[in-house]
């Protein structure tokens, strides 16, 4: 019996307020409007960005259904949708690609102006919501809201992928892998023979390590205070691993001494102001490039001496690894299917969706790299 055009009742993890656990609720998911797509979720990863909302470090309207790193199957489409159809395997895109705005038309940029990250409204692009719980409208998150058995997204925020794709693996390409890997190959444009430093060895940081290796870096120095992550980092391409707590001097000074004045490329993949500054300072003052990948805390600012940049450093930011999402994500999935890279090492835990709070506990304890929830 077709559910197209009907309200679907299903389970979703609702965050009612910050610093509280998710609540598994019965929700109603409205049919997609014109140029929208309703997706049956199959697998979703737990990303640190979702946790930033829980902790209050990333502000978005609540109550909300979070989640943005996922893969699923199209259940139905609204009027006018042409790029996907019911039955297609897809990845929702937390940064859309409308193809019409100034950013989308610029070949060097990917931060589509239809995004809901910079100033989140908690709605779809038409300003309305598709979720209801206990008679109350529930906000969306980043236009994806994948912590739900069904979700609705805009057509420009979903990408059709290879029909043979294992969704419980390629869901990581929806955020973590693409963000980290792309920050190295697209944003920093790591060069063969170069020296790199990666701050933070979670799923995104390890993906940045993989990107540095793929780009031909000669030295990849992984930096984290959790030594348990070092073996995995070396498995994925790190040549050295260091713990800032093992040194009396600032970690940027340690790195500069190790690399004859500083690394060529550095990546902050944590989302802390102190490590953002350390990442900048550890790259060479005349030719180094530092990339901010981690989502920074809300309402906090960095203050720097302009001389740090005047001498020749470059300081950049990266969203979605610089990939134009609707074009780039299917290509990454195709590369995965062609065995150009593996995602297995990043997935440390697989849990049923109902155990979402256990998944976040694993994240907080530092025991997981990526936990994938299956529906």
UniProtKB/Swiss-Prot annotation:
Its EC number is 1.1.1.105. The modification Phosphoserine is found at residue 23. It catalyses: all-trans-retinol + NAD(+) = all-trans-retinal + NADH + H(+); all-trans-4-hydroxyretinol + NAD(+) = all-trans-4-hydroxyretinal + NADH + H(+); all-trans-4-oxoretinol + NAD(+) = all-trans-4-oxoretinal + NADH + H(+). One of its GO terms (cellular component) is plasma membrane. The keyword Nucleotide-binding does not apply. It is found in: Cytoplasm. It is an enzyme of class 1 (oxidoreductase). Keywords: Acetylation, Cytoplasm, Lipid metabolism, Metal-binding, NAD, Oxidoreductase, Phosphoprotein, Zinc. One of its GO terms (biological process) is retinol metabolic process. Binds 2 Zn(2+) ions per subunit. Zn(2+) 2 binds at residues 98, 101, 104, 112. NAD(+) binds at residues 200-205, 224, 229, 293-295, 370. The modification Phosphotyrosine is found at residue 35. InterPro entries: ADH-like_C, ADH-like_N, ADH_Zn_CS, GroES-like_sf, NAD(P)-bd_dom_sf, PKS_ER. The keyword Transferase does not apply. The modification N-acetylserine is found at residue 2. Its cofactor is Zn(2+). GO terms for molecular function: all-trans-retinol dehydrogenase (NAD+) activity; zinc ion binding. Zn(2+) 1 binds at residues 47, 68, 175. Belongs to the zinc-containing alcohol dehydrogenase family. Homodimer or heterodimer of closely related subunits. Catalyzes the NAD-dependent oxidation of all-trans-retinol and its derivatives such as all-trans-4-hydroxyretinol and may participate in retinoid metabolism. In vitro can also catalyze the NADH-dependent reduction of all-trans-retinal and its derivatives such as all-trans-4-oxoretinal. Catalyzes in the oxidative direction with higher efficiency. Has the same affinity for all-trans-4-hydroxyretinol and all-trans-4-oxoretinal. This is All-trans-retinol dehydrogenase [NAD(+)] ADH1B. It comes from Pan troglodytes.
């Amino acid at each position: 019996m077709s559910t197209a055009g009907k309200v679907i009742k299903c389970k979703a993890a609702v965050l009612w307020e910050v610093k509280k656990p998710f609540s598994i609720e019965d929700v109603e998911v409205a049919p997609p409007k014109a140029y929208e797509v309703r997706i049956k979720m199959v697998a979703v990863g737990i990303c640190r960005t979702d946790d930033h909302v829980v902790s209050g470090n990333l502000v978005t309207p609540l109550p909300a259904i979070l989640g943005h790193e996922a893969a699923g199957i199209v259940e139905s489409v609204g009027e006018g949708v042409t790029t996907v159809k019911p039955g297609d395997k897809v990845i929702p895109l937390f940064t859309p690609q409308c193809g019409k705005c100034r950013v989308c038309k610029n070949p060097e940029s990917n931060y589509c102006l239809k995004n809901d990250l910079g100033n989140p409204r908690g709605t779809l692009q038409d300003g309305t919501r598709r979720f209801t719980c206990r008679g109350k409208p529930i906000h969306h998150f980043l236009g994806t809201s994948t912590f739900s058995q069904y979700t609705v997204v805009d057509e420009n925020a979903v990408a059709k992928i290879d029909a043979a794709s294992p969704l419980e693996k390629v869901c990581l390409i929806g955020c973590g892998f693409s963000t980290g890997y792309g920050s190295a190959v697209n944003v920093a444009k790591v060069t063969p023979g170069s020296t790199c430093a990666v701050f933070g060895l979670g799923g995104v940081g390890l993906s940045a390590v993989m990107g540095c290796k793929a780009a031909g870096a000669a030295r990849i120095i992984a930096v984290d205070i959790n030594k348990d992550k070092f073996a995995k980092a070396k498995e994925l391409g790190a040549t050295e691993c260091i713990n800032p707590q093992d040194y009396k001097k600032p970690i940027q000074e340690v790195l500069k001494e190790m690399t004859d004045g500083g690394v060529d490329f550095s990546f902050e993949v944590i989302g802390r102001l102190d490590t953002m500054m350390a990442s900048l300072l550890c790259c060479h003052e005349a030719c180094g490039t530092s990339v901010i990948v981690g989502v920074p805390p809300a309402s906090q600012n960095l203050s720097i001496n302009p001389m740090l940049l005047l001498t020749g450093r470059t300081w950049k930011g990266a969203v979605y690894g610089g990939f134009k999402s609707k074009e780039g994500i299917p290509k990454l999935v195709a590369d995965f299917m062609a065995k150009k890279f593996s995602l297995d090492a990043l997935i440390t835990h697989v849990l049923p969706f109902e155990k979402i709070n256990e998944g976040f506990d694993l994240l907080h304890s530092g025991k997981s790299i990526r936990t994938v929830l299956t529906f």
